[in-house]
Amino acid sequence: MSNSLSSQIFTRKMLICAFTGFNSGLPLFVLSQMLPVWLTDKHLSIELIGAVTGVMLPYGLKFLWAPLLDRYFPSFLGRRRSWMLLSQVALLILLYIISLFDPLTQLGTVANIALLIAFFSATQDIVLDAYRREILSDHELGLGNTIHINAYRIAGLIPGGLSLYLAAIYPWETVFLWTALCMLAGIFMTLFLAKEPKIDMQQTNQPFYQAFWIPLQEFFQRKGVIQAIGFLLFLFLYKFGDSFATTLQTKFIYDMGFSKEDIAIVVKSTALWSSILSGLAGGMIMLKLGINRALWLFGLVQMVTIGGFIWLAAFGHFDVITSAELWKLGVVIAAEYIGVGLGTAAFVAFMARESNPLYTATQLALFTSLSALPSKVLGILSGYVVGAVGYYQYFWFCLFLAIPGMLCLFWVAPLKQENNKTSSV
């Protein structure tokens, strides 16, 4: 058993999954964790900071250009690796350039650059998701996506932890440069680790409207209209509550009275071990229980962890930060990393299982877009909601938003049914 598990984990494919997770997570966490603290340091209001989160909308709309990445691609590295490299180089450059402008006087420029970061990050996600689905067998999806998700979460330790610690010592421009250079890990993977998968390229010769329509048609024919609609509704709702809760997570912690150094130290000390714990547990649980049962179990865990933010918000602003306050923050952050990490791992494995390998880019982009769209659209209003009712009521609202997604599991992932086969054309 031990040797069998080790032989599944320590492979080139799983190493690539770790790299895809890290490079997918880094730019997103810059926008969701590092950017709000930078804007707060520049004395922008909570309403403006919440509105700026609207730049993350490309994550919810990436299905619109996903067919282009299947159909058109530079020839120098192949269909997947060419787009990987182009998006990663663009992100490396943009993550530094954004720091050259003052948000207080040039907020429009900063927002536009952040929008470009989100666009290239979403583009990278399209290709990385498709690539990962193409290199992993159905049996490897649970473990591979667990490794991807936890590397994705660990990537958040840089903009959400180490970079904030450095920001207390160095100018923000230096911090953004250091953070941007971390994208070199993805460039290394693309050039030296990843190999172009061998996939039937017949669909790339079709007219563009067919490249967009046929993957959707295949999905609805395979699932049936009613089941397909239920599946898409589930994608829309399952991560709604916890995604909305974490939209202003770093801003919330900052407003509670914790310094950048406090956030960095606590995140560094708790998020790493909790990510590793959830990664090991999540992969083994999915191998044992299957994806459907994992969705139920992990969904309940991620919903309960929203309660941690409610508990912390109930204390109000801390005038003095002692070890007791740091301990409280550590408990909440650890629970959040475990809960969201587990829930996301099962969710991503579920989406990958339901996609057809011939149309991975378009179908996975549609699936992940639907899961991201609610929080990205309503995230624009998050600052105004907090400004109107406060953090305590806001997190209660997020908890109730998580319930409809759990109810959808009765429809799309019954406990007594486990489909481990991915349909193909």
From Swiss-Prot:
This is Uncharacterized protein HI_0350. It holds the Pfam family MFS_1. It is found in: Cell inner membrane. The keyword Cell membrane applies. GO terms for molecular function: transmembrane transporter activity. It comes from Haemophilus influenzae (strain ATCC 51907 / DSM 11121 / KW20 / Rd). It comes from the Bacteria. To E.coli AmpG and yeast YBR220c. The chain crosses the membrane at residues 15-35, 48-68, 84-104, 107-127, 149-169, 174-194, 225-245, 271-291, 295-315, 331-351, 370-390, 395-415. Its main location: membrane. GO terms for cellular component: plasma membrane. Keywords: Cell inner membrane, Cell membrane, Membrane, Transmembrane, Transmembrane helix, Transport. It is a multi-pass membrane protein.
